[in-house]
Amino acid sequence: MQKKIETVKTLLDSLPFIRKFYGKTIVIKYGGSAQIDERLKESFAIDILMLYMVGIKPVIVHGGGKRITEILTALNVKTEFKDGVRVTTAESIKIAEMVLSGEINKEIVNMLNQHGAKAIGINGKDMSFMKAKSLVGYTGEITSIDGVFVNKLLSESLIPVIAPIAAGDSATHPGYNINADTAASEIAAAIDAKRVIFLTDTPGVLDKGKNLISSLTKEEIEKLKQDGTIAGGMIPKVDAALRAVERGVEKAHIIDGRIEHSILLELLTSEGIGTEIKES
C-alpha cells in the first residue's frame, strides 16, 4: 500500500508542471548516448509518450553524426572537420541524408509509434519548410523555417521527428546538412515553443570545480565563456540554447541524456537535473 501511495504522490507532485506545459510545444534535440544505448532509447520513447499523453506537444530534432562517420569510413569517403563543423561535400551530403532521413529518422518514428504515439518523420526538404545557404561546402546555415507547417502537424496531434537536412535554392540542389543543435534552436524559435531541451553526454554546464550550474543568464554565460569555464564542445550548445531564448523561447535546458527519464525529470520536477538557460 505504501508503494501505491508514493506512486500517487509522485503523480500529484508533477501536476503543477503538467498544468504549466499543457498545450505547449517542447522541442527536444535528441542525440548522444540517448540515441545509441538501447536502454536509453526505451526511456526516451516513454518520456515522449508521457508528454504526448498529458497534452504537451513534443517536437524532436535528431542528430546522427557518429553514424554518418561510420558509413563514410566504411565507404572510404574522407571526413573533414573545420572549427568543429563537419565539412559536407557533394558526395557526403547524399550519404548524410540517407543516414539521417532514411535510417535514423525512420528508426525513431517507428520506436515512438510502437509505444502508441503518432509520430511522423520529415526533413527540411518536405514542403521546403527549412531552407539554408552554404556555411562550408554542403554544410548549411539556416535562412528560413516555415513554422506554420510544423505547427500544422502539431495541430493534427502528430509528433514531428525532424532530420536536420535543409532544402537548397533549386529543385536539383542536393540540400544542406545542418548542425542538429542549431536546427533545434531555430525550429523552437520559429514555432513559438515554450522550451527547448538539448540531450547531451554531460550533466549540463559545469563550473571549474566540475559542479553542475543549475541556472544561467545571458550575462553569466558571457562571463563564463570569457574565463574559459564554458569551452570546447559546450560552446556551440550554449550558443544554440541562448539563440533560442533570445528569439522568444522561455527557457532552454542542457541535460544529461545518459540518465533514464531525463526529460521528465527536467520538466516535471521542481529541482530538474540539468542547466536551464534564460535571458535574464
From Swiss-Prot:
Q: Name one GO biological process term.
A: arginine biosynthetic process via ornithine
**Which keywords does this Swiss-Prot/TrEMBL entry list?**
Amino-acid biosynthesis, Arginine biosynthesis, ATP-binding, Cytoplasm, Kinase, Nucleotide-binding, Transferase
Which top class of enzyme applies to this chain? transferase
Gene Ontology molecular function terms on file: acetylglutamate kinase activity; ATP binding
Name the pathway. Answer: Amino-acid biosynthesis; L-arginine biosynthesis; N(2)-acetyl-L-ornithine from L-glutamate: step 2/4
* Localization (cell): Cytoplasm
**A Pfam family annotated for this UniProt entry:** AA_kinase
Which CDD domains does the record associate with it? AAK_NAGK-C (cd04250)
Keyword Ribosomal protein attributed: no
* Catalytic activities: N-acetyl-L-glutamate + ATP = N-acetyl-L-glutamyl 5-phosphate + ADP
Please, which domain of life does this record's source organism belong to? Bacteria
Output a single Gene Ontology CC term carried by this record: cytoplasm
The EC code for this enzyme is 2.7.2.8
**Residue numbers marked as site, Transition state stabilizer:** 29, 237
Question: Transmembrane ranges?
Answer: none
Q: For binding substrate, which residues are annotated in this chain's numbering?
A: 64-65, 86, 177
Q: What does this protein do?
A: Catalyzes the ATP-dependent phosphorylation of N-acetyl-L-glutamate.
NCBIfam families per UniProt: argB
Q: Which family does it belong to?
A: Belongs to the acetylglutamate kinase family. ArgB subfamily.
Q: What is this protein called?
A: Acetylglutamate kinase
Q: Which organism is it from?
A: Nautilia profundicola (strain ATCC BAA-1463 / DSM 18972 / AmH)
